[in-house]
Regions:
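C-terminal-of-GTPase-core extension/linker across diverse P-loop GTPases
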Residues: 1-3, 7-16, 20-27, 31, ...
Length: 252
């Protein structure tokens, strides 16, 4: 099902709306975003990425939505300055929260590449629901850690260790890394592993969720209670026992 929402205007324009119609339109658009699997963000090629576009991309990422960015009015762009690849790279750089999004350049006026938008949406939806075998994930993990091992914690000899990874869910694809201690994996190494998943497996247009689960800390074993002292038998009488009968007789 496709839902075409009204454009979400700047906050100042929404606040200035006398009848509240703008706010109602924004509320409906936000509900549509939360219901959707794939969000399509339309950008004016001449205007470029705006602050409002940036905020919306941040919302899509936080909601875990697959994203397709459509750069419209491509017919108005100077081809000597912009190529499709250069525009896509520029858009992904500015919309850093959805740097993984699919980018399609179109001209709605002339109907150019409009069908590519639907194809990108379908593919993003497929990737959003995709499951990957555990064996494939761990093969990628093994190669990634061989190429770049987890760092050693500064000031100690402790080193991060990854036992295995498995997929925990979809929409968006979510993965759990089982490690010795999640605190030993800084953000840059976590981003490195996400890039390795994308480079080797794909997921174009879909966000990924990576979770880290450390080994549970063992509770220190309680010492067993000392055995209760028991009263000793007759051997403890004073004098060390009785003397033998004739031991004390004198010689005549």
């Amino acid at each position: 099902m496709l839902i075409d929402t009204a454009g979400i205007r700047k906050r100042s324009r929404v606040a200035d709306s006398p009848d509240g119609a703008e706010q109602l339109s924004v509320d409906r658009a936000m509900r549509a975003v939360r219901r959707a699997d794939v969000a399509v963000l339309v950008i004016d090629a001449l205007e470029g990425v705006t602050q409002q576009d940036f905020r919306l991309s941040e919302l899509f990422a936080s909601e875990g939505k697959a994203v397709v960015v459509v750069v419209n009015k491509w017919d108005r762009v100077d081809p000597r300055i912009w190529s499709v690849e250069k525009m896509a790279e520029n858009v992904r750089t500015q919309l850093r929260h959805v740097s993984w999004a699919s980018v399609v350049c179109t001209s709605a006026l002339y109907g150019r590449h409009v069908e590519d938008v639907l194809q990108a949406v379908i593919e993003a939806g497929v990737q959003h629901r995709r499951r990957v075998p555990t064996a494939t994930l761990n093969m990628v993990l093994r190669e990634a850690t061989q190429w770049k091992a987890p760092p050693t914690q500064r000031g100690s000899l402790r080193k991060g260790r990854i036992y295995y990874v498995t997929q925990a869910g979809t929409r968006p694809p979510s993965f759990v890394f089982f490690v010795n201690d999640e605190k030993l994996f800084p953000d840059d190494y976590r981003r490195y592993l996400e890039r390795q998943l994308r480079d080797n497996i794909g997921f174009p247009g879909s966000p990924l969720r990576l979770f880290w689960r450390g080994k549970p800390k063992r509770e220190p074993r309680a010492k067993p209670p000392a055995p209760a002292a028991t009263a000793s038998s007759g051997g403890g009488a004073a004098g060390g026992g009785r003397r033998s009968g004739g031991g004390g007789s004198s010689r005549r």
